[in-house]
Regions:
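Core catalytic lobe of class I
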Residues: 1-181
Length: 181
């Protein structure tokens, strides 16, 4: 199963995996009937249970999700799903924001809500997360000296990113209804 691509229902694929087989899952599943996927049914409870089963004890699941607005209210599906993963036994390790550079449906000047331009990236773990953070944020205070001319408390040249990740999204040359960076 390693280094393979399976173009099938994820429940079929995961059913062939042993317990604790996966170290990292990053996925952005369909949500709130925003798109039609030619007869695909999104069985969230079954998918969540299988993800928990196949995730390694030190594994991580990144669930990228958003909410539709229906009858003037956001659905809250993202939060219900996050709570369900926690109910199954996952720990909510981090709540991150995936900020897009543009929106398919920008707010109008006379609208009563702002342009929806982000999705949640819920980072779940079964146990302790040992992976290192991406440290590519340049520190403007690195090498700074105090008034006496001494090197102030050492500040590294680079620090970990924040939990808001900005991505440029594009559909150039991509024939997918929901492109992902």
């Amino acid at each position: 199963m390693l280094d393979s691509i399976f173009n099938e229902n994820c429940l079929d694929t995961m059913s062939r995996m042993p317990d604790g087989f996966v170290n990292l899952t990053v996925t952005s599943p369909p949500y709130d009937d925003l798109r039609e996927y030619e007869g695909y049914e999104f069985d969230f409870p079954a998918i969540a249970a299988e993800l928990y089963r196949v995730t390694h004890e030190e594994g991580v699941l990144v669930w990228v999700i958003g909410d539709a607005t229906v009858n003037g209210s956001e659905t809250g599906s993202s939060f219900r799903q996050a709570l369900h993963f926690m109910y199954l036994g996952f720990k909510l390790h981090d709540t991150m924001i995936y900020e897009k550079n543009s929106s398919t449906f920008p707010a109008k000047r006379n609208s009563n809500r702002y342009t929806q331009i982000f999705e949640y990236m819920f980072v779940f773990a079964k146990g302790r997360v040992e992976a290192g953070l991406i440290c590519d944020k340049r520190n403007k205070w690195a090498g700074h000296k105090d008034y006496s001319g001494k090197l102030a408390n050492p500040v590294p040249d680079f620090s970990p990113r924040t939990n808001i990740w900005r991505y440029v999204t594009s559909t150039n040359g991509v024939k997918h209804p929901a492109p992902f960076p």
